[in-house]
Amino acid sequence: MNSLQVLTKKVLIETKAFSNYHEDDIFILQQLGLWWHNGPIGFCKQCKMVTSGSMSCSDDDSYELDRALVKAVKENQTDLIKLFVLWGAEINFGIMCAKTKQTKDLCIQLGADPQFLDVGLYNMFVYLVKRKKVLLAIEIYYDNILILDSFDSYDFHLLIDFVYNRFILYLDEKDEEMTRNALVLKFWYKFAIDFKLVKPIRYLSKKFPHLDIWRLKAAIYLGNIDEVHRAYFQENIRLDPNDMMLLACMYPQNKLGIYYCFALGADIDNALDILLRFDETNKQIHRETRGEIIFNIERGYLINIYFCISLGANPYIKKIQDTIKQKHSNIMILLFSKKKLLSPHSVLQNKILDPSDVYKMISTYENTESFYPFSSLAVKLIQQAK
């Protein structure tokens, strides 16, 4: 049962009674619990976003309702907790972050499952992944050592998909320096970059500037050229293009990442040589993956190899030929002997850096590509090599 005070706050906020307030009103609003962080609380019923002061729903700092609840629970804001639940926030998110017995008891009174901390943590993490709730997950798990320590080692590594993500999570870090807290942060940050979730990326880049170089590396590795363009040209976060190309080549089927490094000035012949030497690197990154995943990875690296040639890499120079012979790759020797088969693609010869134009160009290339690794011709050549 909600108090008259909470119901009154709900009405006042929903009717935007404080959208125009005087400086003299601030103290009164604070005392009445209608002031949160930098201004009067606002709520958009359409998009379920909680705002503060003059911010809009689309601002990086605005809060989706469940995330606002978690924040209020951390701050032990009793009336706000009740208010956010009244608007429809999921109270079980709140109980995960309750720091005091009083706040935990309040969450239970408002409908939280007392057993949730024992039986619901794993499913909640999976739910947040499926719904791509990056900022909510960060709010719940980051710096929540009690919750992180409640997972045993196997469950924790399973949750963050450690086999698949380990390489990118550990960029710039030594194994012994990585805490669960840092791993969870990087997992969700990487998740946002991978799925091009702009608002979470912008929020996290402001909150964790020490990860700016890692963010650029992750964006290159995952082929998120929108984020690479922003970091490189708007935020002046820079790396040597050849170092970036090494990362781009490590991710299967990464045409966007490889092209962007090429357009920034990376040596495309060197990129081809890197890819042809990737057997050991591939094992290092994916050493624990299953057989069917290995097949897709190998196919993905072949696509990268042919794409580099389409960009102008010369497979017939001595350096490349020596690498092929060192690798004892009969398949590559046969393919690269077909000089008319593998050649630069005319669509890709202009170096452009605007992401929207790059997407169009790559799409045109894929629609006009005459040779790709698993075409009937390629399969026939591979069978001959064997």
UniProtKB/Swiss-Prot annotation:
Q: In its UniProt entry, what is this protein called? A: Protein MGF 360-4L
| Organism superkingdom | Viruses
Stated family: Belongs to the asfivirus MGF 360 family.
Task: State the species of origin.
Answer: African swine fever virus (isolate Warthog/Namibia/Wart80/1980) (ASFV)
Q: What does this protein do?
A: Plays a role in virus cell tropism, and may be required for efficient virus replication in macrophages.
The protein's matches in InterPro entries, at most eight in alphabetical order, are given as:
ASFV_MGF360
BP-aspect Gene Ontology terms = taxis
